[in-house]
Amino acid sequence: MFMRAQGKKTVVDWSDCPIVEVVPGKVSGVPILKGTRVQADSIVENFDGGSPVAEISANFGIPETTIRELLGFAARQQSRLQP
């Protein structure tokens, strides 16, 4: 279900993700999980780096279901970009 980047940074356009928001002046206006200060890209980078969902959840204090939803969005977007 989820894709791990193979030596490459996963680039995601979070603008259509329902659980991500951009708040000017909050975390420098980067995409964050709604209601948090956790950067969406940080979750993906941790996963791409080999961290399991349970570990990411514990480290960031975000429910595993939310982590999976975020990673699923990123994977679907990446699959649309693949030739």
Positions of the model-derived regions?
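Acyl-CoA thioester-binding alpha/beta core of soluble enzymes
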Residues: W14-E21, A54, A75-R76
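Short, Lys/Arg-enriched anionic-surface-contact patches
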Residues: C17-V38, L81-Q82
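Hydrophobic packing positions characteristic
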Residues: M1-S15
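Long, charge-rich, low-complexity alpha-helical segments
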Residues: T36-P83
